[in-house]
Design a protein with these regions (language model features):
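Periplasmic-binding protein-like
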Residues: 37-42, 67-69, 89-105, 124-126
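Short, hydrophobic alpha-helical segments
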Residues: 32, 151-162
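Venus flytrap/periplasmic-binding-protein-like
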Residues: 1-4, 108-134
Length: 252
């Protein structure tokens, strides 16, 4: 394993983040209960192989009577050819893909985007890296949330908080995140399996929905301004009428 020789001081804390893809996989499968074939795709880098091993360990315990295929010895083009013609009721999992069989480097979001764009079946990842680029989403680790947590922790420490009092839990960085475009693609928009309060990205927001408060404020301002002008016109008319009557009275 990796052992850090970092020396901590009284203003430093360690944020321990535990990745548990098994929970992500289990939830993804619930979304597609008719699934009969499972494909775990991976690159050949050490981290790629680690995530493939984690997926394999879970599958060997929980998918005993299903068709499970592990792919880590293909280049990207061969993988794209594969996912274009997967059998019906298949699911694809891409835990990590940084290096293909031809030693061509990819970053995880790029790889999952390419695979998702060509796949005839739903594609899932284990984290928010690449979310919005093709994977459906699910119960995944959010590195964005980790970054936010670290930033907030730093502020607390600088304000005098005890570093040892700052702890991160699974709820701080795991969350339900879904891409609305993929939910529509796979007919999951109205699924009761999507937990309430989930984060939905790529929502189709109309101009009025996006700027309704601004539009409302402008309309309210125009209405009030119109009423004010109308009132001023009325007051001016009354003032002229009163002035005319005064003049007529004085001339008598």
């Amino acid at each position: 394993g990796f052992v850090s020789d970092m020396r901590l001081n009284d203003k430093t804390t360690i944020v321990n983040m535990k990745l548990d893809p098994s929970k992500s996989i289990a939830f993804d499968i619930k979304l597609f209960p008719e699934t009969s074939s499972f494909y775990f795709l991976s690159g050949i880098s050490p981290i790629d192989k680690l995530f493939l091993a984690i997926g394999r360990e879970w599958a060997e315990k929980n998918l005993l009577y299903k068709k499970v295929t592990y792919v880590s010895d293909l280049n990207m083009q061969e993988i794209l050819n594969l996912v274009r013609q997967l059998p019906k009721n298949s699911l694809v999992f891409v835990g990590s893909f940084n290096l293909d069989a031809d030693s061509v480097e990819y970053n995880n979001p790029e790889a999952i985007r390419l695979i998702s764009s060509q796949s005839n079946s739903p594609v899932f990842g284990y984290s928010d890296m690449g979310i919005g680029e093709g994977p459906v989403g699910g119960y995944i680790a959010s590195f964005a949330n980790v970054g936010l947590f670290v930033g907030q922790a730093a502020v607390k420490i600088l304000n005098g908080a005890d570093p040892n009092s700052i702890k991160i839990t699974e709820q701080d960085y795991y969350q339900y995140i879904f891409d609305l475009r993929e939910l529509k693609r796979w007919n999951l928009v109205n699924s009761e399996l999507i937990p309430a309060g989930s984060t939905i990205i790529n929502e189709d927001i109309s101009f009025l929905d996006r700027y309704k408060w601004i539009v409302g404020a402008v309309l309210l301002f125009l209405v009030l301004q119109t009423l004010l002008i109308a009132n001023l016109v009325r007051l001016n008319r009354n003032q002229k009428l009163m002035t005319r009557k005064v003049i007529e009275t004085e001339n008598r």
